[in-house]
C-alpha cells in the first residue's frame, strides 16, 4: 500500500524586501519547497507559501516549527526595519500533491553557462553547460534570486577571467556559490555557516553534485580561519558584512577579490563600498538587480 505524503503548509505575508531572505531560510534550514503566490510586482504583500514534508502530522511538532520560523521572521523584520510578517500553518495529506508541485520547478539558467536543475529532473547538459542539481529553494522558490545570480556572475568573472584558484564562501547556506565557483574552474573551495542545518544541507548538495573532493563545508567561525584565499564571497546582509570587515580583509590574499551581496540598492551598496574602502579594498564593479545589489572589490 502506498503511503500518502504528509506536509506542513506555512503561509507568510511579509514585506517584499524580506521575500528572498525568508525563502532562502525556509529552504536551507527547513528543507522546504517554496512558492510565491504571485509575482512580486503584482503582490506587494510579499506572500510566501512553504511546504515542509513531515514524518507524522504532529500538532506539537508543527507549532515548534512555526515558532522557530516566527522568531526568524521577527529578527529579519528588525534588520530590515519593517513590520513583522504574519504566519499561518495547516496540514496537507495528498498523494499526488507533491508531483503536481514539482511541475512548477524546471531547469533554468541562473547565469550564462550554469544551469540549476531539480534533483528529480535528470537534466542532461547541452554542450559546455555546467549543472548544479538542487531541490527547490535557493534558486527555484522565488525565481528572483538577484543576490545569488549577481554573486555567481562575479564568481564566474573572477574564476574564469582573473584566475582565482581558492574560494571561501562565508555564510554558504545551501552551498550554491562555492559549488558554482568550483564548476567555473576553482581548484578548491570552503563553505562556512554558523547554522548546523545549513551546513548539513550544503554538505549533502556538495556530495550529490560529486564535488566533495574539491569542496569542504564546515561550521568553523570566520574568526578562526587562518588561510588566505584568492576569492572570498559573502552573500549575507549589510550590517553583518559591515561587522565582519576586518575578518574578511584578513582572509583575502593581497590583490585577491571579495564579492559582497545581500545588499539593498542603492544606499546599502554605497555604504558597504565606503566601509570596505577604508580598510583597503578598491571597487571594481557594482551590480544592481531590482531591489538588490552586489559589489566586486579587490584588496590592495
Swiss-Prot record:
- Per UniProt, what is one GO molecular function of this protein? protein-lysine N-methyltransferase activity
Keyword vocabulary terms for this entry: Cytoplasm, Methyltransferase, S-adenosyl-L-methionine, Transferase
Q: Where in the cell is it found?
A: Cytoplasm
Recorded hits in InterPro entries, A to Z, give: Ribosomal_L11_MeTrfase_PrmA, Ribosomal_PrmA_MeTrfase, SAM-dependent_MTases_sf
What this protein catalyses is:
L-lysyl-[protein] + 3 S-adenosyl-L-methionine = N(6),N(6),N(6)-trimethyl-L-lysyl-[protein] + 3 S-adenosyl-L-homocysteine + 3 H(+)
Q: Does the keyword S-adenosyl-L-methionine apply?
A: yes
Annotated HAMAP family: Methyltr_PrmA (MF_00735)
Protein name, please?
Ribosomal protein L11 methyltransferase
By which gene is this protein encoded? prmA
